[in-house]
């Protein structure tokens, strides 16, 4: 049995059409991930599927490929009626708990469907509804939406209906039911056809998810691609116990040890992300914040700059810890230990994705020790300590203190908590005119320590 499990089938061997196999190859998907290998055969047969999979497991492909294959068969393999192919508009709908995740899912659909003229629309809050109405007027094959905005259009947009829907996807269903979407979700389910295929994907199987499963799936096949709370084997996890007053020094030390790496740093509050990003910028690091306080356009702008390499450090709250498809994240640093240990799993899930290696480092102060102990209990392992030269760390104290002082003054001058919708001028100045500043200010450290990258 173990030998059978070790055999990795190709997408073609799983029954995926040649057009989509080529699309997978273009995306660098050489072989199916575990969730794809287990879910695709059933999904391609037309069965309802429940997939329990961790972040970064490739679950988007597990539902996008069957939908696109069914769309191809519906258009090209069905008998034409009165000389015309059936209209495949509003063929599938994917519901997502966040705007960012919806946009990422749509991007993957468009990449996979590039050769088949796929039409895809995104319906999320924070984006002009008139633009979305125009997109719906083009009769997209696939809609990716948050439940609230989708229901707004179903209620108010003239001529829009999902009566012809063939596929429904509930992605990150545990979060869909935990973020005040339950009412909108129930309204949507009452309006769409009962005769449809449904895919439900979730990180955990909660009571609410089970209830949703019973309500909207028919004889589903359950695929569990990971243990309930686990981290991938390619993730190197470490911690460092530090006094609270020295935590910033340790953070700067760690970032200086790996200057070319892409990093995500998690803080507990929105103000904390902005303050820490300001501190790091003043020390020459290319950091940018993202949090729920920012407008949608600013959040997407920050993500795009991070993806494009204009900055290599993203300072974020847990709003960014799930669902963001950011490639090549090398390091995740828990600057603030999460009070909910399950959030740790989602945070470190930003690295070591799709078979790549990655590092997760937690900075634990004396007030966070109990939370950290709960994390180790959850993942079932004791983590090794991140080795650091204490003398080198403490030598940063004066520079870090000065940077914190300047950043606090900057925050105070701009009114502390930025008003929602206000431009992040510091980000624009930093990214627009000081791209080389980090390397210049840290020049000595870069040559000295870049060779140590990931040896820890």
UniProtKB/Swiss-Prot annotation:
Residues 250-394 form the Helicase C-terminal domain. GO terms for molecular function: ATP binding; ATP hydrolysis activity; RNA binding; RNA helicase activity. Disruption phenotype: Plants are indistinguishable from that of wild-type at 16 degrees Celsius, however they generate a weak phenotype of pointed leaves at 22 degrees Celsius which become narrower at 26 degrees Celsius. In the leaves of plants grown at 26 degrees Celsius, the xylems are located on the adaxial sides and the phloems are on the abaxial sides, similar to those in the wild type. Plants with double mutations in this protein and in AS2 or AS1 protein have abaxialized filamentous and trumpet-like leaves with loss of the adaxial domain at high temperatures. Residues 434-448 have a biased composition (Basic and acidic residues). Keywords: ATP-binding, Helicase, Hydrolase, Nucleotide-binding, Nucleus, Repressor, RNA-binding, rRNA processing, Stress response. SUPFAM superfamilies: P-loop containing nucleoside triphosphate hydrolases. Residues 407-456 are annotated as: Disordered. ATP binds at residues 53-60. A motif (DEAD box) lies at residues 171-174. It catalyses: ATP + H2O = ADP + phosphate + H(+). A motif (Q motif) lies at residues 9-37. CDD domains: DEADc_DDX47, SF2_C_DEAD. SMART domains: DEXDc (SM00487), HELICc (SM00490). Residues 40-223 form the Helicase ATP-binding domain. GO terms for cellular component: nucleolus. One of its GO terms (biological process) is rRNA processing. Its EC number is 3.6.4.13. Expressed in all tissues and organs examined including root, cotyledon, first and second leaves, third and fourth leaves, fifth and sixth leaves, shoot apex, flower, flower bud, cauline leaf and rosette leaves. Involved in leaf polarity establishment by functioning cooperatively with AS2 to repress abaxial genes ARF3, ARF4, KAN1, KAN2, YAB1 and YAB5, and the knox homeobox genes KNAT1, KNAT2, KNAT6, and STM to promote adaxial development in leaf primordia at shoot apical meristems at high temperatures. Involved in the processing of pre-rRNA intermediates at high temperatures. The Q motif is unique to and characteristic of the DEAD box family of RNA helicases and controls ATP binding and hydrolysis. Belongs to the DEAD box helicase family. DDX47/RRP3 subfamily. PANTHER family: ATP-DEPENDENT RNA HELICASE (PTHR47959:SF24), ATP-DEPENDENT RNA HELICASE RHLE-RELATED (PTHR47959). This is DEAD-box ATP-dependent RNA helicase 10.
């Amino acid at each position: 049995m173990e030998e059978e499990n070790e055999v990795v089938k190709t997408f073609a061997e799983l029954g995926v059409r040649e057009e989509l196999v080529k699309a997978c190859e273009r995306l660098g998907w050489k072989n199916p991930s575990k969730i794809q290998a287990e879910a695709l055969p059933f999904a391609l047969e037309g069965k309802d599927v429940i997939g329990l999979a961790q972040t970064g497991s490739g679950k988007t492909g597990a539902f996008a490929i069957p939908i696109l294959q069914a769309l191809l068969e519906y258009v090209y393999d069905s008998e034409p009626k009165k000389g015309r192919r059936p209209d495949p508009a509003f063929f599938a709908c994917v519901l997502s708990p966040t705007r960012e995740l919806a946009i990422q899912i749509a991007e993957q659909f468009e990449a996979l469907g590039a050769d088949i003229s796929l039409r895809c629309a995104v319906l999320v809050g924070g984006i002009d509804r008139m633009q979305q109405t125009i997109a719906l007027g083009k009769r997209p094959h696939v809609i990716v939406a948050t439940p609230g905005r989708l229901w707004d259009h179903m209620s108010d947009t003239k001529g829009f209906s999902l009566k012809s829907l063939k596929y429904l996807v509930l992605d990150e269903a545990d979060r869909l039911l935990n973020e005040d979407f339950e009412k909108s979700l129930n309204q949507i389910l009452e309006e769409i056809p009962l005769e449809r295929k449904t895919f439900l994907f979730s990180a955990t199987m909660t009571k609410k998810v089970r209830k949703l499963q019973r309500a909207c799936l028919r004889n589903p096949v359950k695929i569990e691609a990971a243990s309930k709370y686990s981290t991938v084997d390619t993730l190197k996890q470490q911690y460092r116990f530090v006094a609270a007053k020295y935590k910033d020094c340790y953070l700067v030390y760690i970032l200086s040890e790996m200057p070319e790496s892409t990093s995500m740093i998690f803080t507990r509050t929105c103000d904390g992300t902005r303050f820490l990003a300001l501190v790091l910028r003043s020390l020459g690091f290319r950091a940018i914040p993202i949090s729920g306080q920012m407008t949608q356009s600013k959040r997407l702008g920050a993500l795009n700059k991070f993806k494009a390499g204009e900055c290599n450090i993203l300072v974020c709250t847990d709003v960014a810890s799930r669902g963001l498809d950011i490639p090549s994240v090398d390091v995740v640093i828990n600057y603030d230990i999460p009070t909910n240990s399950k959030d740790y799993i989602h945070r470190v899930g930003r690295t070591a994705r799709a078979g790549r290696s990655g590092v997760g480092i937690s900075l634990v102060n004396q007030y966070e020790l109990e939370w950290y102990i709960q994390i180790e209990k959850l993942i079932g392992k004791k983590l090794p300590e991140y080795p650091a030269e204490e003398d080198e760390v403490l030598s940063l104290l004066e520079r870090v203190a000065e940077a914190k002082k300047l950043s606090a003054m900057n925050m105070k001058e701009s009114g502390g908590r930025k008003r929602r919708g206000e431009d992040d001028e510091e980000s624009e100045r930093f990214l627009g005119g000081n791209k080389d500043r980090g390397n210049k200010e840290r020049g000595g450290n870069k040559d000295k320590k870049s060779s140590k990258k990931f040896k820890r």
